[in-house]
């Protein structure tokens, strides 16, 4: 990216201004623009520029100018061209600014299409650096040329002389534009080289990534590339050997042919020599000596032919020997390439074996890790299940203990009406509930057999007033409220589940009081167990529901006593048959 100096004092701001050292700039023919007697150089070579390299930058009031990798000026990420930007005065010089940011573009300044000489020089510099030559410039032997006007003078001098002056156009190099052109070529070549190197690197990286993605290791990929290079070297060396072998064969054929051509020449030489020997006797004969000299000339020609042919043979042999030497070198190169190929193959095999070994080790490690993970998972699951069992057991114990307390409390309250023996039976039932964990409730048939002992007792006949009072008490039970209260007994069940169970117990209890059929109530408890609820939990929920109902009763004492006996009978029937007998023998008959 160019800077410039038009000869002013300069403000030292780099490319956008100038670092001048000359006198103040002048106008017309004054200043450093040249004398009137040596012509107009069209502002060529008079303004100096400073080359900025890719990556250089400077600040202007309109934004930061950055030279990109291609040597182009950019502002706000946009490459500035003659179409989208203008030369704007800045300091004591000019700088290029995007048109969209310029409020007042540079006004015309004389010649050059309204542009100042400095502005024109900078734009020419930019254009040439981009590889384009402005009108009036051309390239000659790597130099940027243009035409300049020069004055020529002829004739005599003095006051009365006939001196004549005229102007001619002559070609002249513009060194600064030549440097700009070469700099642009260098920048573009470097950019092309970088792009090519980056493309090759990307291609190699993509190939390597594909190879690794297919399962190859980095070492295996590198070894494979080495094998490819070695094979290419073998192919080249083999082609060279083949060519040289053909050349040696051709040289041997030439030698054979020339040796064959030598035979008649030697025969001719021998014949010529024979003729010379035969004419030696004429050498002193003035008349016939001419014959000898003619034969002698033929001998010389024959010897020359033999020598020439021998030289050709020697040259052919030397050529063959040279080719053999080259062939030997080529064979050595070929052998070296084959050795390299063997080494590369070995390296590839080793890398492949190493990869396979590593993969096997990885698989073994993965399998071991998976087995360890499975063992850990199994152990964690065992621990979780054990904790869950322990937690359930804890919840069940908590439920049974609190239910036991509830039943004991119910026994104390109802015992106020039925006496201490009822309290003792209720306490026995409460203790059985407390220790019921791990046990199972009695079957429906067995439980009903025990319960029927109570309901069949004539003394357990319930009059209508008491029945209505007990049924009405059940009808006023709020299942949600009771479930919320029972929910505090244990985490063994959810309140939502208890609501449904309380509702079922309420419905079946009402049915029992109204019809005297307590089978549906007993079947309800059995259905809980069949659905997966532990017997202890089922007994706890059932007993707690009935106990909470009994504790909430505000009915006459006789009705409370009936409810207490039926509660003990129903709950006790699920635990042991003895409670039915105790109720019949110790509570019901004495009470009625």
UniProtKB/Swiss-Prot annotation:
Recorded GO CC terms: plasma membrane
Q: Where is the composition biased (Gly residues)?
A: 1-13, 23-34
Query: What is known about what this protein does?
Result: This colicin is a channel-forming colicin. This class of transmembrane toxins depolarize the cytoplasmic membrane, leading to dissipation of cellular energy. Colicins are polypeptide toxins produced by and active against E.coli and closely related bacteria.
- In Gene Ontology terms, what is a biological process of this protein? defense response to Gram-negative bacterium
Under the heading InterPro entries, the entry gives:
Channel_colicin_C, Channel_colicin_C_sf, ColA_N
- Report the sequence similarity comment from the record: Belongs to the channel forming colicin family.
What Gene3D superfamilies does this protein's entry cite? 2.30.30.970, Colicin (1.10.490.30), Helix Hairpins (1.10.287.620)
Origin superkingdom: Bacteria
Q: Which UniProt keywords apply?
A: Antibiotic, Antimicrobial, Bacteriocin, Cell membrane, Membrane, Plasmid, Transmembrane, Transmembrane helix
Do you know which Pfam families this protein is assigned to? ColA_N (PF22348), Colicin (PF01024)
Principal localization reads membrane
Where do the record's region annotations for Disordered lie? 1-57, 373-395
One function term, GO molecular function aspect? pore-forming activity
Protein location: Cell membrane
Q: What is this protein called?
A: Colicin-A
- Organism placement in taxonomy: Bacteria, Pseudomonadati, Pseudomonadota, Gammaproteobacteria, Enterobacterales
Q: Which residues cross the membrane?
A: 528-548, 555-575
Q: How does it sit in the membrane?
A: Multi-pass membrane protein
